[in-house]
Each structure stands twice: as C-alpha cells, then as structure tokens.
From Swiss-Prot:
The gene is uppP3. The keyword Transcription regulation does not apply. Keywords: Antibiotic resistance, Cell membrane, Cell shape, Cell wall biogenesis/degradation, Hydrolase, Membrane, Peptidoglycan synthesis, Transmembrane, Transmembrane helix. Its EC number is 3.6.1.27. This is Undecaprenyl-diphosphatase 3. It comes from Bacillus cereus (strain ATCC 10987 / NRS 248). Bacitracin is thought to be involved in the inhibition of peptidoglycan synthesis by sequestering undecaprenyl diphosphate, thereby reducing the pool of lipid carrier available. Belongs to the UppP family. PANTHER family: UNDECAPRENYL-DIPHOSPHATASE.
C-alpha cells in the first residue's frame, strides 16, 4: 500500500468514525470501490490511533480533569457506559466479525443503522446536560454502543440515538457520545496490537503509517467539531437517508453480482 492509499483510508476513518455512518463499513467499501490494497492490521490500528488523537485534542480539558479527578462522576459515567461493550466485545467479537464481513451483511447493517437514525427524532427534545446524566443513562447508551460490534452499525450513531432517547439535549448527546467513544477506540487498539504482536499483521511502510494516522487525526477532529455543532439544530434523518441509499446500493450490487 502506498502513502496516497493510506491517506484516503485515513480520510474515510477520520470522517466516518464520528459521523453516524459507520467507519468500519466505509473502510470495507473504500478498499473495494477504489481497489485499494488491503490496509493490513497494523495500518488499521494506526488509523484508530489517529482518531483517538483527534478525541484527545478536542477533549483535552476533559481528559486533564479526568487525570486530576480519577474518581469523579464523569469518570464513573464513562466506566459504566463502557461495561456493555467490553462484555459483548470480549465474548462475541470473533463470532460477529466472522459473520459480518460480507457485502450482503454490511448492506443490511447499513439499513439497520438508518432505521435507528431515522427514529432518533421521534422523541421530544430532551434538556439533560452533562451534570444531569445518570448512571442508568450511561449504561443504556453504552449498551447501544455494544451493538456496533457489527462492522456497519455506527457506534457514534447508536450512542447519539440512545442519548437522545434518554432525553439528553442534542449538543450534549453528541458531546457525551464522542467522549464515550474513547474507551471503545482504546479497546480496539489494544485488541489489534495483540494480533500485531502475534504476527498477524502485514508489513507496511512507515511513510504510509504516518500519513494514514495523521490523516485520520485531522479529519477526525473536523468531524467531531462539526458534528457537535450540526446536531444542535439539525436532524439525523439526512444520515439515515444516506446509509439507506448505501445499503440498498450494496445489496443490489451483491444480488446482481456486480460488487
């Protein structure tokens, strides 16, 4: 894989990690549609590090606060919200990955993501701010994130939807969702590094790794800041229509054996 291909995958990872449209599903599509080489496990890991860097930069004040106050309510909320994903991920990760990395299943998963995004605005706008979030809220939001073990189910989409249903206001829903993404991204990186050290990763140039990581970080930061502002006044339906269209297109191409 050359540096330009790594740059493209970094853009895809950075934008789609935080827009509610599934990063894993889009990376799968990007490799096929642009006929890119398989990125390799090591580059996948570095792309996740790039998006993690984006979150750290955007939430630098919050992370400094968490370091200074490790037993704060915010830290406990993040721990409670992470528990469902940890349990599901450790128990069923390999099973779900084996059944999900085909065009047909990814197409259906995009349709499911679209359904939840469309239904997000059916409830009345909530008013909960960060200080109002309960541990029950965090656990339920985290449980929705655990569903994103399916590759084309959007983690950010599911957590934002759950947060809106739990009556968080729109800005806080996106804000907490992205903050909660940090443990999930860290967990994915750890699991991928285990595979890397077990010799499952393909070799790739250091230039491609650096370019892909920085690309994911840059575009990830843009996506986080834009999405939080966007959700203040806009519906998630546009994303629902997008992933529905994408899912229908993928299924059509699969059934006609074009893709």
């Amino acid at each position: 894989m050359n540096w330009l291909e790594a740059f493209i995958l970094g853009i895809i990872q950075g934008l789609t990690e935080f827009l509610p449209i599934s990063s894993t599903g889009h990376l799968y599509l990007g490799r096929h549609l642009f006929q890119l080489d398989e990125a390799g496990l090591f580059l996948d890991t570095m792309l996740h590090i790039g998006t993690l860097l984006a979150v750290f930069i955007y939430y630098k004040k919050e992370f400094i606060y968490l370091i200074k106050n490790p037993f704060s309510k915010l830290m406990l909320l993040l721990i409670v919200g992470t528990i469902p994903a940890v349990v599901i991920g450790l128990l069923f990760k390999d099973f779900f990955e084996d059944i999900s990395k085909t065009g047909i299943t990814i197409g259906w998963e995009f349709l499911v993501t679209g359904f939840f995004l469309y239904m997000a605005d059916k409830x009345k706008n909530g008013r909960k701010k960060m200080d109002d979030i309960t541990y029950k809220d965090a656990f339920i939001i985290g449980s929705f994130x655990a569903v994103a073990i399916f590759p084309a189910i959007s983690r950010s989409g599911m957590t934002i939807v759950a947060a809106l249903w739990r009556k968080l206001d729109r800005e806080t829903a996106a804000y907490f969702s992205f903050l909660l993404s940090t443990p999930a991204i860290v967990g994915a990186i750890i699991l991928q590094f285990v595979d890397v050290f077990q010799g499952k990763a393909e070799s790739i140039s250091s230039t491609s790794l650096i370019v892909g990581t920085l690309s994911a970080a840059f575009f990830g930061y843009i996506a986080v800041s834009w999405m939080i502002q966007y959700l203040k006044r806009h519906s998630l339906k546009v994303f629902a229509y997008y992933v529905w269209g994408l899912g229908i297109l993928i299924l059509t191409l699969q059934f006609t054996r074009v893709f």
